[in-house]
């Protein structure tokens, strides 16, 4: 069975084909013999009724010179033209029997063929004249033809032409006496100004089509009309589900997907599903490393052009969207909407697992991964997976060494902006996080959380080797190295090995002499920030750590721990040479130098060596004459803090050293030792 061909192809074949015309006398005789039932009131031209007449009977009707249905600018020279005009969008097969074309009865076409088969868009209905037996005019056929691309549609009994079927429908539904008078445009009339504009704007090479509302130019008449529909508010395509109207059929089809629960497009990377293919394609670009769209201002690259356009607004000073509550302005309306939820407290996105609510849907999606354990973002270098793409990007800087965030004060670079913000507080001295129990302030929230464990006594981190518990995970990790004996960090200058990188960094300051942390009170410098913090308590007198046994307070937690061993008698650090035990690891280290004879600390003034750095520091005061420790009672100054403490007992009368033999008390331990000799001689 031959397929339907376009009008141009048929015409070219007829003009070029040799032999007699297919419009033969036999065909004309057959047409003239066909029964012709006329429309009521149309006896003058004998318009045949579509329900009782085959196509051949309409051929002479189309060629009546005075027929109302014959348009001024459309003539049908061949029966193929009539056939195509009537059925251009219907899938109807043609059977050639000699020179006569057989088609289904047109009444069947009127009544039985579905609106969708005729190309009528979803949400529109055929006019009354097409849904029952009645006028099946060329104009009605134009209505069926229009939505699928034909350019010119004719209105029955009204010499007008339209480019969109909705405008033709509107024309047909107006009574003849109410139709407007023809504009002076060759006798053609239009119901809407947009139709007149569409009629006037036949494009030529010299004059493109211009929209009178916005000045936009078009090369095609349908594009101009679609633009003008936006301005006039005319919406021709209606959704059957919600009644919403649209100016374009393609937009209606996209809208229909919002009523569908099924999401047909699923991402193979992360499993997220989408209703529309365009949304699915945009999402997939997030997984791709390709970022072809680059900002000319800052060089930042994006996977989507829309993301680039949004980013470029960040370089613009204009922020047209302002919050009515606080006056903060935003470049995007979506950002303003999200911001306003801070004031309203609205959190519309609720987790179905735990009930936690979020202001943004993106935060809910990220949170869901804590329940599912999903980590869709994997590092190509080491294979480590992350639940968020932002975490992956931060991690990748470990491999690249990139540190894009630089401190304006000292020039120190950082891989994360959060680390830069924390570092800035070193320069500003800002400590925004305050303990509600003791009032102590911290520069980082994590430091406050760790500090609060002093008050609560919480030690959530337990060593699985010895069962010892710690308040901080970092301290547990350091402790576990005691069991392994591992010291992977070695000094390149002296070869000394350390179990922690921080200890190595601090040690290297011995060789470089670098002491970047200075005390604002006395100017003393330190190689470690922690030592500076401890030193500053000398000036403030702060002693936040209190012994629960005797009430004694200490400036350092480590000193408190060491002190508590006096009460419990615990001496966990034992010398493997002589078996002597100590309550402090530092005392054991100092003691072991007795066996080795090691004195690594040498005075640069006199060359004297010492086994402990503290002894060297105390010795150097002899050369400098410095006496930094002053008694608050009498003003007397001392070179050593321990001597000051002993001196203060003169004023307080404290005698902490008791003789076990006679009970006599002494203010100094050395005096107790001398006294005990009296009993041993006896």
Swiss-Prot record:
There is a cross-link at residue 253 (Glycyl lysine isopeptide (Lys-Gly) (interchain with G-Cter in SUMO2)). It is found in: Nucleus. Interacts with INCA1; the interaction inhibits INCA1 activity and induces the cell cycle process. Keywords: Acetylation, Activator, Cell cycle, Cell division, DNA-binding, Isopeptide bond, Metal-binding, Mitogen, Nucleus, Repeat, Transcription, Transcription regulation, Ubl conjugation, Zinc, Zinc-finger. Residues 62-210 are annotated as: Necessary for transcription activation. Residues 268-393, 341-373, 473-503 are annotated as: Required for nuclear localization. The modification N6-acetyllysine is found at residue 487. SUPFAM superfamilies: beta-beta-alpha zinc fingers. It comes from the Eukaryota. The lineage of its organism: Eukaryota, Metazoa, Chordata, Craniata, Vertebrata. Belongs to the krueppel C2H2-type zinc-finger protein family. GO terms for biological process: cell division; cellular response to sodium dodecyl sulfate; negative regulation of apoptotic process; positive regulation of cell cycle phase transition; positive regulation of cell division; positive regulation of cell population proliferation; positive regulation of erythrocyte differentiation; positive regulation of kinase activity. Pfam families: zf-C2H2 (PF00096). Acts as a transcriptional activator. Promotes cell proliferation by facilitating the cell cycle phase transition from the S to G2/M phase. Involved in both the hemin- and phorbol myristate acetate (PMA)-induced erythroid and megakaryocytic differentiation, respectively. Also plays a role as an inhibitor of cell apoptosis. Residues 1-10, 113-125 have a biased composition (Basic and acidic residues). GO terms for molecular function: DNA-binding transcription activator activity, RNA polymerase II-specific; RNA polymerase II cis-regulatory region sequence-specific DNA binding; zinc ion binding. GO terms for cellular component: nucleolus; nucleoplasm; nucleus. SMART domains: ZnF_C2H2. A zinc finger (C2H2-type) spans 209-231, 237-259, 265-287, 293-315, 321-343, 349-371, 377-399, 405-427, 433-455, 461-483, 489-511, 517-539, 545-567, 573-595, 601-623, 629-651, 657-679. Residues 1-33, 112-134 are annotated as: Disordered. This is Zinc finger protein 16.
């Amino acid at each position: 069975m031959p397929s339907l061909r376009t009008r141009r192809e048929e015409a070219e074949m007829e003009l070029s084909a040799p032999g007699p015309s297919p419009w033969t006398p036999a065909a004309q005789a057959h047409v003239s013999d066909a029964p012709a039932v006329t429309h009521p009131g149309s006896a003058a031209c004998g318009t045949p009724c579509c329900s009782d007449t085959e196509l051949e009977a309409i051929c002479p009707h189309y060629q009546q010179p005075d027929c109302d249905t014959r348009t001024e600018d459309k003539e049908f020279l061949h029966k193929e033209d009539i056939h195509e005009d009537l059925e251009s969008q219907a899938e109807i097969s043609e059977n050639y029997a000699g020179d006569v074309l057989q088609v289904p009865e047109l009444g069947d076409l009127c009544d039985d063929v579905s609106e969708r088969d005729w190309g009528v868009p979803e949400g529109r209905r055929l006019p009354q004249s097409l849904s029952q037996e009645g006028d099946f005019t060329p104009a009605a056929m134009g209505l069926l033809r229009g939505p699928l691309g034909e350019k010119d549609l004719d209105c029955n009994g009204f010499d007008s032409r339209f480019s969109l079927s909705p405008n033709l429908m509107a024309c047909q539904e107006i009574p003849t006496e109410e139709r407007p008078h023809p504009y002076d445009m060759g006798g053609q009339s239009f119901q809407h100004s947009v139709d007149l504009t569409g009629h006037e704007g036949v494009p030529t090479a010299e004059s493109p089509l211009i929209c009178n509302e916005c000045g936009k130019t078009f090369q095609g008449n349908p594009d101009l009309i679609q633009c003008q529909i936006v301005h006039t508010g005319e919406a021709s395509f209606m959704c059957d589900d919600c009644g919403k109207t649209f100016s374009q059929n393609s937009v209606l089809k996209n809208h229909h997907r919002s009523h569908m629960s099924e999401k047909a497009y699923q991402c193979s990377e992360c499993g997220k599903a989408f209703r529309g293919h365009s949304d699915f394609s945009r999402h997939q670009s997030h997984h791709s490393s390709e970022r072809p769209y680059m900002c000319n201002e800052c060089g930042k690259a994006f996977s989507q052009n829309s993301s680039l356009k949004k980013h470029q607004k960040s370089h613009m000073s204009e922020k047209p969207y302002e919050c009515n509550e606080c006056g903060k302005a935003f470049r995007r309306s979506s950002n303003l909407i999200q911001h306003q939820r801070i004031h309203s407290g609205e959190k519309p996105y609720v987790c179905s697992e735990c009930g936690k609510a979020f202001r943004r849907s993106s935060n809910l999606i990220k949170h869901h991964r804590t329940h599912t354990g999903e980590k869709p973002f994997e590092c190509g270098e080491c294979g480590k997976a992350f639940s968020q793409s932002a975490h992956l990007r931060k991690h990748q800087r470990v491999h690249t060494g990139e540190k894009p965030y630089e401190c304006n004060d000292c020039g120190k670079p950082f891989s994360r902006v959060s680390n830069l913000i924390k570092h800035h507080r070193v320069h500003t001295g800002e400590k925004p996080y305050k303990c509600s129990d003791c009032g102590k302030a911290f520069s980082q929230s994590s430091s406050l959380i760790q500090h609060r464990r002093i008050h609560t006594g919480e030690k959530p981190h337990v060593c699985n080797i010895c069962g010892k518990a710690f308040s901080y995970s970092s301290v547990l990790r350091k402790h576990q190295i005691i069991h392994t004996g591992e010291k992977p960090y070695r000094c390149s200058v002296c070869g000394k090995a350390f179990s922690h990188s921080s200890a190595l960094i601090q040690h290297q300051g011995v060789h470089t002499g670098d002491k970047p942390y200075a005390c604002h009170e006395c100017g003393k410098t330190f190689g470690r920030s922690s030592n500076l913090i401890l030193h500053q308590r000398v000036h403030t007198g702060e002693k936040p750590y209190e012994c629960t046994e005797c009430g004694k307070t200490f400036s350092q937690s480590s000193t408190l721990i060491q002190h508590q061993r006096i009460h419990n008698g615990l001496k966990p650090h034992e010398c493997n040479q002589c078996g002597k035990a100590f309550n402090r690891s530092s005392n054991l280290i100092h003691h072991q130098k007795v066996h080795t004879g090691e004195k690594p600390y040498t005075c640069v003034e006199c060359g004297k060596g010492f086994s402990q750095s503290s002894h060297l520091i105390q010795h150097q005061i002899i050369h400098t004459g410095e006496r930094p420790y002053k008694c608050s009672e009498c003003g007397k100054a001392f070179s050593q803090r321990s001597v000051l403490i002993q001196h203060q007992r003169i004023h307080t009368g404290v005698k902490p050293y008791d003789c076990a033999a006679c009970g006599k008390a002494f203010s100094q331990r050395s005096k107790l030792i001398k006294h005990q000799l009296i009993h041993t001689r006896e």
